[in-house]
């Protein structure tokens, strides 16, 4: 498909009656290929119809241009046909006459017989042969919309534009018309752009779904590729492995936009007290056993002890929620996968650098690679068994879940696969899934396995859904798991608060490491407020240090919360994670990697906090030892990258970092 429509960096500004301005759209860039069906989705007021009107030529952008086949769109015309929700039929004309009026006006060069044939063809196309002589007042809403579709297609437009065409129809009629439109677009390779509020409609009809953020200044928050093959049938679409992940992706985006709107309206003023710049903090977490230090700091009073007496823990269902909260400035800090501060700083989020610092490693270990019971029943007990299965699969796709590109789950899973000569980008399909969804997807058969933190490996085993083929003790013992992350500008604006936060969480980590507190912490985590799960699935660690065995219904977590060199941020470890993210194309490897590590790893903040608590600080650099015996050379990371056998075509580039400045006083 060739480029057909180009929306080039457009803004749309409306003048207000009081002399002010309203910025509806800001910096919209979109390319549409010939024959592609693109849906625009977002909340009311996000500018969907405004964008559609500019593509139609019904309105002009304030800045930027829109082109059709390389020609600038300046006005409406029959090459760009719009179907509105309200049909726009002439009430005194019949079905046939409404369509014929458009055909006669546009196709004056065709003979009367040719025009008549075109009208009849499109009446039959939408199934209205029995109603050709009826006027709009005699038709149902669905029939009227079919007339509008037939009229639009009959004049052979280059581009079909639909503004919520089925929004006013009942569910049955809407479903039938969606099927008809889908069939027509597939048959005639129609290029279409549709505005919709209906998530299922967008997934069913689209090749791509463009998600718009809230206004004012709405922009494209994400574009989803719909990888469901055509021709499509509704019941086959809902059974496709991608259907529910696409649907949940859109719903997550829409819910997140609602939340952002509320947070914008809230604008909590920072409360300074106890010598701290801010005591009312919003800290994000994902419900995992690894969130124990945050829960303990809140419930056992460590936050309050260090002056942070108005802390709110914000529960997110996925790491993407944490990313959005940090990127948007709606969270003061968060529990993060160990690689996320580096990923954000190096431009992993929408290819823009968001400097994030980490002054505390809160957990180590706690991960495992789980495969389905179906694979176990097929005799897949080792990585080599799995590799042989893939070699014999004859093109069958095997999907493995992970939680985020920057997570140790993704990096360790990829490392484990590659070390066993399995290409994680070619031989399997890696899919980002929220942790709490892993077991359900494993049971449903939409994935073959995953790498995730507890309690989801233990739960899969206890419920007979899967088994752990490897734990982190067998891949990289004592690797960093979760860290505390805050934006760099926030840390600069709140230096005393930052130290107090690290002190509170470091004390909480020590509390979690005491075996005498395990049952108390398990009970706290199991409550509805936090993990909301059966306490039997929650274990902080196994004092005997056992790893899982195949067929053993009880598998153990190996979290380490506190100990010598366990909590200090390590530049060497962050460098290893940086090389792995570059290896798999999630970030370019930064030429200025030393600068990035210095900006990310705030050893000084950790040292201050630890010493004020009376803890010793060990600065000795530890070697990184993974199961395959490969040595990580922290002095020459590019040489290390070049020595990897399986990798993507990684790039090396300077990552531009702005000079650090304090965050605004509003959270």
UniProtKB/Swiss-Prot annotation:
The keyword Cell inner membrane applies. GO terms for molecular function: ATP binding; ATP hydrolysis activity; nitrate transmembrane transporter activity. Residues 281-667 are annotated as: CmpA-like. Induction: By carbon dioxide-limited conditions, probably via CmpR. The keyword ATP-binding applies. Keywords: ATP-binding, Cell inner membrane, Cell membrane, Ion transport, Membrane, Nucleotide-binding, Translocase, Transport. GO terms for cellular component: plasma membrane. It is found in: Cell inner membrane. Belongs to the ABC transporter superfamily. Nitrate/nitrite/cyanate uptake transporter (NitT) (TC 3.A.1.16) family. This is Bicarbonate transport ATP-binding protein CmpC. It comes from Synechocystis sp. (strain ATCC 27184 / PCC 6803 / Kazusa). The gene is cmpC.
């Amino acid at each position: 498909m060739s480029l057909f429509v180009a929306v080039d960096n457009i803004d749309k500004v409306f003048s207000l009656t009081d002399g002010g301005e309203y910025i509806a759209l800001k910096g919209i860039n979109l390319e549409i290929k010939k024959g592609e069906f693109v849906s625009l989705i977002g909340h009311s007021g996000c500018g969907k119809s405004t964008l559609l009107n500019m593509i139609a030529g019904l309105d002009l952008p304030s800045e930027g241009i829109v082109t059709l086949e390389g020609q600038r769109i300046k006005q409406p015309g029959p090459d760009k046909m719009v179907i509105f929700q309200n049909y726009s039929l002439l009430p005194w004309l019949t079905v046939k006459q409404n369509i014929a009026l458009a055909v006669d006006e546009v196709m004056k060069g065709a003979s009367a017989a040719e025009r008549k044939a075109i009208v009849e063809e499109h009446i039959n196309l939408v199934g209205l042969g029995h109603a050709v002589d009826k006027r709009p007042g005699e038709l149902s809403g669905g029939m009227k919309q079919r007339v509008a579709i037939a009229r639009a297609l009959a004049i052979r437009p280059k581009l079909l534009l639909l503004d919520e065409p089925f929004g006013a129809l009942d569910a049955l009629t809407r479903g039938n018309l969606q099927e008809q439109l889908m069939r027509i677009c597939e048959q005639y390779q129609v290029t279409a752009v549709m505005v919709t509020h209906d998530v299922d409609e967008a997934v069913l009809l689209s090749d791509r779904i463009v998600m718009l953020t809230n206004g004012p200044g709405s922009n494209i928050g994400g574009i989803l590729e719909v990888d469901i093959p055509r021709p499509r049938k509704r019941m086959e679409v809902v059974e496709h492995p991608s259907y529910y992940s696409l649907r949940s992706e859109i719903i997550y985006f829409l819910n997140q936009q609602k939340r952002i709107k509320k947070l914008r309206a809230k604008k909590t003023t920072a409360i300074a007290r106890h010598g701290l710049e801010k005591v009312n903090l919003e800290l994000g977490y994902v419900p995992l056993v690894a969130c124990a230090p945050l829960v303990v700091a809140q419930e056992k009073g460590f936050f309050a002890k260090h002056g942070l007496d108005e802390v709110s823990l914000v529960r997110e269902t996925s790491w993407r929620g944490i990313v959005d909260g940090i990127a948007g400035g709606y969270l003061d800090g968060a529990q993060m996968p160990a690689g996320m501060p580096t990923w954000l700083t190096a431009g992993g989020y929408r290819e823009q650098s968001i400097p994030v610092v980490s002054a505390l490693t809160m957990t180590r270990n706690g991960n495992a690679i789980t495969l389905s019971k179906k694979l176990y029943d097929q005799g897949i007990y080792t990585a080599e068994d799995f590799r042989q299965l893939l070699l014999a699969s004859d093109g069958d796709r095997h999907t493995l879940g992970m939680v985020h590109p920057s997570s140790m789950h993704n990096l360790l899973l990829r490392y484990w696969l590659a070390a066993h000569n399995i290409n994680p980008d070619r031989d399997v399909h890696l899919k980002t899934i929220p942790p709490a969804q892993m077991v359900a997807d494993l049971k449903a058969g939409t994935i073959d396995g995953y790498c995730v933190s507890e309690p989801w490996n233990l739960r899969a085993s206890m419920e007979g859904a899967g088994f752990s083929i490897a734990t982190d003790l067998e891949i990289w013992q004592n690797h960093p798991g979760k860290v505390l992350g805050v934006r760099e500008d926030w840390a600069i604006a709140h230096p005393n608060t930052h130290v107090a936060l690290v002190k509170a969480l470091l004390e909480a980590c020590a509390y979690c490491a005491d075996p005498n507190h395990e049952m108390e912490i398990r009970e706290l985590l199991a409550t509805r407020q936090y993990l909301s799960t059966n306490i039997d699935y929650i274990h902080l660690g196994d004092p005997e240090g056992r790893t899982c065995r195949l067929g053993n219904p009880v598998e153990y977590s190996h979290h380490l919360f506190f100990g010598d060199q366990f909590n200090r941020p390590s530049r060497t470890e962050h460098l290893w994670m940086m090389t792995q993210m570059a290896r798999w194309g999630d970030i370019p490897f930064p030429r200025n990697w030393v600068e990035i590590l210095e900006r990310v790893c705030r050893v000084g903040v950790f040292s201050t906090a630890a010493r004020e608590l009376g803890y010793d600080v060990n600065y000795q650099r530890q070697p990184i030892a993974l199961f395959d015996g490969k040595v990580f050379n922290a002095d020459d990371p590019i040489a290390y990258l070049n020595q990897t056998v399986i990798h993507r075509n990684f790039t090396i580039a300077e990552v531009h970092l702005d000079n650090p400045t304090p965050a605004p006083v509003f959270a």
